Amino acid sequence: MNTQSQTIVVKLGTSVLTGGTLKLDRAHMVELVRQCVHLKKLGHQVIVVTSGAIAAGREHLNYPELPKTMANKQLLAAVGQSCLIQAWQSLFAIYGVNVGQMLLTRADLDDRERYLNARDMLQALLKNGIVPIVNENDAVATNEIKVGDNDNLSALVGILASADKLLLLTDQSGLFTADPRKDPKAELIKEVHTIDETLRKIAGGSGTALGTGGMATKLQAADIARRAGIEVVIAAGSAENVITDVVDSKPQGTKFLPVECALESRKRWILAGPASNGTIVIDDGAVNAVQQKGSSLLSKGISSISGHFVRGGVAKIVNTKGELIARGISRYSSDDLHKILGKHSQDIYAVLGYEYGPVAIHRDDLVLI
């Protein structure tokens, strides 16, 4: 067993916690808890990102079918979250371990100060030997109950905690060359060095009815985490000793190797935190300058703007084919950029009557994707 202290984020999908049924599988949950506690005893820090609130609420209320309306889904989440945290609390208590609940929303990560507060709270729990149990605040977060929820959340939590490993446990044994449920010739991809369009095409859509994340969202989460220097493993939550095996570097599922030059703290926040409310399309010359030369983005290289964002807001940067190039904090609002796009830096003041510097997005505020 690897005894060097590590911080491990374990994301447990609804399919893992329910075993494909309509209620929580507490017998399996206690086995997962046993593995987490074993890691703690070896000096590792463990964070659990849990799905299952809607499933727990449906079980508790004996709800006949999965509701279609947002309000009723959030009703089940509100009831189920208390059941879910009670289940985790009672199971960890068997081993004398305390847990602390953290319910996050996108707003907690969009704002830099709130992001840092969340990071400090997470670190405080870990330093006091408490296992953080993290979930999206489903009852109020309208953007959560759709594809991408806790997979992406677990990557963001990994960044908050400066984690070493992120385990995305699901009902599949990892990422395959095709959907193994449909193609008997599908082969497990054991190790991934680069996430490209080929892999994205292999990844499918949403998974189970009770859950909201499919392999595509896990791939997206893996890409975010590995860019922050975190090793990611997608594996079957039902596999024997899957958590302890991954930490001990034994083969389980699909391993995504982290990027060697991990991002510094502020750029991690740009990558993980704020939602992008607008898109900046840049020409080929600007793409080359940003990607190959590490330059700042100038207004001259901007072809068009879509969406709305304020000065200091985060925008997606794409090439003329619509391919995502980067994310960055804009020094000018979208309204201002509409006026100065294609203009030389020295012309900004003449056009606007003011300026916030010669660049649209400084390279220190730019994260390549």
Curated annotation (Swiss-Prot):
Substrate binds at S51, D138, N150. Keywords: Amino-acid biosynthesis, ATP-binding, Cytoplasm, Kinase, Nucleotide-binding, Proline biosynthesis, Transferase. It comes from the Bacteria. The keyword Transferase applies. The keyword Kinase applies. ATP binds at K11, T170, D171, T212, G213, G214, M215, A216, T217, K218. GO terms for biological process: L-proline biosynthetic process. GO terms for cellular component: cytosol. Pathway: Amino-acid biosynthesis; L-proline biosynthesis; L-glutamate 5-semialdehyde from L-glutamate: step 1/2. NCBIfam families: proB. Belongs to the glutamate 5-kinase family. This is Glutamate 5-kinase. It comes from Aliivibrio salmonicida (strain LFI1238). The lineage of its organism: Bacteria, Pseudomonadati, Pseudomonadota, Gammaproteobacteria, Vibrionales. The gene is proB.
